[in-house]
């Protein structure tokens, strides 16, 4: 046989042997790999979608579908790591004999509240170094609530919710850590799903998933000129992978005046008729409970319907909420319908994500005369509601109580408004840890109010007006654009994060107002205003306005922690506002905070009953915008008339001095805090001590003329100080598989003081503020150096009679 044939035979044989060996190896590998299938459920048997199933030590992983099922190919004998937010992570050992897995995850109580929303992002609760209180849906105030603010009742130390009236039209007033301004805004900034400047009345209480309250300066400084009064960040129910489900909730509530003011009865009043100390007492021969005549037991109802579903790539949530609330004062009510839809879509293994949220609310509400309750308390209890002819009884003079029944029945005051919030967000994650997002948002508010008085109203009986009509219509459009990039990276025990962003906000507010009196008939109500005699005689009042306002901001934040033991955060915002003077349109708002997690130290690590113990310190500077435009500019207003060229011509005169140095009020705050958790989170809480000073307070001051054109001027002068301590304590008294009973308590103490009202240029010792309604007509408060804001000022009781009257 030739040699070349031998070589060919040997070469072919070697190739054949190689192919056989490779085939055997593939068959061996295939024989070692198996498909494992299973389902993941919670302790109550509910399937869990979106659970991460990962082959331990590899990048081989899958997620459960909407029914909680999964399938993964791996080598038998390896382990699976099963993780899900809010549940204890499990490690499952596999084998070749069992390829069908039924996995149960237990709820992790300590992790349920582990994510806290901060400005333009979120952090683990253990890494937070500022004074932030996070309240989740499971911990909201139970029962029917009239407004979303009420969900926080008793849950946040330092947050004061005030309801001064039974009027269902008015919501709750909120203040955080005292009053920080004399003439600017005193309410916290509301951020809804990332949109700043929202209103809680625009959303349904049932649609809220969590509320995070940013209380101190180091937390709120990232919001710049709007963070002085704190920030409330609301996250609504979000679309996520889950089985399609439909939920309906309904509730009914009753409300009444629980305790009436202790006033004289008709018999008590009659006994004073012959008392020389009380001249002018008149016994009109009847017994009338005026408060009872204008009040009622109010019935309210709420209906909420929601739909949600979708898979890991595309999911949705939609809801509709209807509320009807009566007020305890007759002819007061509020009716609203709110609809929401949220859509999520993820592409390219979650590297590209889209979010769309639309929330629309329509409200109609009816008001009663603002001083009805006050006049009911002041009215003569022996006076009848109607005279013998069926007409309302009236004193027919000013500075006497008005018949509150007539004031309610003969006045029409109805308001309707629509609030629309829309936002779209796109997020790109090109590499691990890096997220680049762009968000565009639009908020639109349209309102119309119509008010009229009949011929039987006090204004006709006393003043002879023969009907009054007021009509208001206004519209506000807010457009927001935000670009945010954040990057997180861990190097062993070193964890760092960087965030930078840009924000642009454009507000456009416009409206019209008209007033007239003297109807030929009161059958028209607030309509057909053109038929009023005032319109024909050119005595009616009409006006319109338009205001625009812009905010431009650049902001950033750096975070670092070493082994989640030593933590540091610094942020900075550079913001410009069109409302301020030419010399101070831009400002810097820095913040820094640090934390030490003592429970991570070796000397406390073996203390089994201690879950977490963290010390915090933070300092931040925030600003407070003025509430109006053009306050820094030289303005002219219409003045008197002059007879020029054969006709009367209205002139113009200066009414506001320019102030190019007008700027925002500035608040600096130092906060010391301690967070703790014991006994596997059965007992947890926080303690905070703070010191805040608001300087450059805005107020109007008298100035000499000349050199000034007008005798008053808006300027930054005063200073307010707030100091206080806050305590939040939460405990789980009962915790079983089917029952959990939590107790939460808060304590807060705030000492407020007006430090100064004057400086070298502007002087003012005090001024009066607030007023009572008719017929008393006097001031109620005084603003004075050394006093707290809101200090009452008025007459004091001199003495009591022997009868205690």
Enumerate the predicted regions with their spans.
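Switch/connector loops and helix/strand junctions flanking conserved nucleotide-binding motifs
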Residues: 125-126, 222-224, 242-243, 257-259, ...
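Extracellular/periplasmic, surface-exposed regions of secreted and cell-surface proteins
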Residues: 140, 187, 193, 270, ...
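Solvent-exposed beta-strand/loop surfaces of large extracellular or lumenal domains
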Residues: 60-61, 218-219, 460, 705-713
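Short, intrinsically disordered, charge-balanced linker/junction segments flanking boundaries
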Residues: 791, 796-805
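Low-complexity intrinsically disordered tracts that form flexible linkers/tails across taxa
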Residues: 365-378, 757-763
